[in-house]
Regions:
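Short coil/turn motifs that cap or connect alpha-helices
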Residues: 136-137, 219, 369, 499, ...
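Short, membrane-interfacial amphipathic segments enriched in basic
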Residues: 232-248
Length: 590
């Protein structure tokens, strides 16, 4: 931590000159754009500054003053993490939110498609009459398209208004709580408009159009007869008479509603993915800190400004630099290139002088395997490098490439005695602080995960509760569709003397069994879906790497949440069953 204090001139004179450092900031007369141009400009400036200081020091020495000046640190903008990290961090947040956004849109489109399909089933007689009266299929398609598309458009407009007004401060404060940011000006963002408004409307339009076109292909006569399928009626499955009557009745309900239960399963699958995605990140960040600890190279990783020797036992020299990735499918990543000693005590892997090993994160994120070529480039020049991967090394703290120190020196044309720092498990006390650029410890390695927890904390709560709400709504809507499609059968059972509780035991119990089965079966599928989403989308839209890890407790929570949600929904459906009149059984009877 840094503390700033004011002192009088007289008080400042009492401060030892050994502890005084003069800091200066500079700004280019002409704007420099791009890291490569900034590197060239900053090197020119440093060279000129060095010449000026050298000339000044010469004059001091000639005047008998030995307190000469030197440059102890130099930090241009393009290497300043305090300036660049916030933008990079927001970029990964954006990728996460966009993935969540598209999952939600798919869920909503699915709900509208199911609702529209159910509406067509209920109004089949009316549609058949209209078709027989001369109305074209395209006219009916337009009629049923209006509501879902109009609702989506209104919701998108209202969402944009809320995003730029009432909710603006909330999301701004998420980042103000994490970073020391300057004041901001709200600007309309075309990309955000496309992602949150145009894309959802297109998805909604296409999904509903496909459903309607498929449903309305039937002839008017079939609509009038309520025969809403081209498939021939299947023969009834024979059930053993040894089974109790209520069990056979319940099984018959399940067999008759297989298409509805498949729709319910698909809905639970999508909603389950939404819930797990919204609750997985907090434990994932904690688990990430644990795997970083386990794969940490050493307790203290010294990075030096200039070479300095140490007599400490156990200290091991290494080389390090960074290169950029070239694959245009992904955002540009900084890859740490380590040159390590032969038979290293800290990096326990056997590497030959003509090969390289990559961290497991590189393998997973870029979909690489042994024998593949990994292309990298110098971010400040046109020089490119091609490395053939000989294997992987478990190192989760960063995206890294490991090679022998000799190979590093040959590859980057360094002196034979060149090194960048030391790996060690204890502090080095015989190296002057002026030679030390930084010391990387476990606390430094997990700063990223801690920062993610702070910056994403409030956002994750929003995703979590929103995901749960969507789960409940989807469960309610889909189970409601099943009751409505069986309204005539339920009405008939009432005429036969069944009570509301008994009917609920038949229809709701059958659906409850299918809900539990769907929740359990969906667990491995949701896991595979999210893993695919990480590798195919999230990794391409963010810098850095965080492994895909989902605790089992997240899936257990999904199943329990689904059961609890359905228990609430079942009560509501029991009320709905009680309101179905017996007269429904007399309607639409062939």
């Amino acid at each position: 931590e840094m503390c700033i204090r004011d002192r009088t001139d007289k008080g400042f004179e009492n401060v030892s000159s050994n502890h005084v450092k003069y800091n200066y900031a500079w700004k280019y007369n002409k704007e420099v754009i791009g890291d490569k141009a900034e590197k060239e400009a900053s090197e020119d400036f440093l060279k000129n500054l060095g010449d000026v200081i050298k000339e000044y020091d010469t004059k001091l020495i000639m005047s008998g003053n030995n307190e000469i000046m030197n440059i102890s640190d130099y930090l241009p903008r393009y290497t300043n993490k305090a300036v660049n990290f916030t933008g990079d961090d927001m970029g990964s947040d954006k990728a996460t939110i966009m993935l969540f956004d598209y999952i939600v849109v798919v869920v909503i489109a699915f709900v509208f498609a199911v609702t529209t399909s159910n509406t067509i089933s209920q109004e089949a007689g009316v549609i058949g009459t209209l078709r027989a009266s001369g109305y074209k299929r395209s006219e009916i398609v337009r009629h049923y398209m209006v509501l879902p598309v109009a609702v989506t458009m209104v919701a998108a407009v209202v969402g944009n208004i809320l995003g730029y007004t009432l909710l603006e401060k909330f999301f701004v404060n998420v980042y103000y709580n994490s970073y020391s940011l300057c004041t901001y000006t709200t600007l309309l963002n075309a990309e955000a408009f496309v992602d949150t408004t145009v894309v959802p409307i297109i998805i909604m339009f296409v999904v509903n159009l496909i459903v309607l076109e498929k449903k309305l292909r039937l002839s008017p006569l079939k609509f009038l007869r309520h025969e809403l399928t081209n498939r021939k009626r299947k023969k009834l499955i024979k059930l053993s008479h040894k089974l109790p009557f209520m069990t056979r009745f319940r099984l018959r309900i399940m067999f008759q509603n297989i298409p509805n239960y498949l729709t319910l399963f698909l809905g639970i699958l999508i909603a389950g993915a939404l819930v797990v995605f919204s609750i997985m990140f907090e434990p994932l960040i904690d688990d990430y800190a644990d795997v970083v600890k386990k794969s940490q190279i050493c307790d203290y990783q010294y990075v030096l400004k200039s070479q300095a020797e140490t007599d400490a036992s156990g200290a091991e020299k290494y080389c390090v630099t960074s290169l950029d990735t070239t694959d245009e499918k992904y955002m540009t990543d900084d890859i740490m290139i380590y040159g390590i000693q032969d038979n290293s005590r800290y990096v326990d892997v056997d590497i030959k002088d003509d090969e390289i090993i990559v961290s497991n994160g590189v393998m997973v994120k870029y979909g690489l395997k042994k024998g593949d070529t990994f292309k990298l480039k110098d971010p400040y020049s046109d020089e490119e490098y091609e490395f053939t991967i000989a294997g992987s090394y478990k190192y989760d703290a960063a995206l890294a490439v490991f090679m022998t120190r000799k190979n590093f020196i040959d590859t980057f044309d360094k002196a034979d005695d060149y090194f960048t720092g030391y790996f060690t498990d204890k502090k080095l006390t015989d190296i002057d602080d002026k030679y030390v650029a930084s010391i990387v410890t476990y606390e430094d390695l997990i700063k990223v995960s801690n920062q993610m927890k702070v910056s994403m904390g409030e956002m994750m709560y929003i995703l979590k509760y929103f995901g749960i709400i969507m789960f409940v709504l989807l469960m309610y809507l889909l189970s409601k569709q099943i009751i409505e499609k069986n309204a005539q059968s339920i009405s008939m059972t009432k005429i036969l003397g069944f009570k509301n509780g008994e009917i609920g035991g038949l229809y709701i119990a059958a659906t409850s069994i299918m809900v539990v089965i769907s929740l359990v079966v969906s667990v491995p599928i949701v896991n595979a879906m999210l893993k695919w989403a990480f590798s195919s989308y999230l990794y391409t839209m963010m810098t850095g790497y965080i492994p895909y890890m989902v605790r089992r407790s997240c899936f257990v929570e999904m199943v329990i949440l689904g059961i609890v949600c359905y228990a609430v929904v079942a009560v509501l459906q029991l009320v709905k069953i009680s309101k179905i009149p017996k007269t429904d059984a007399l309607k639409n009877v062939e």
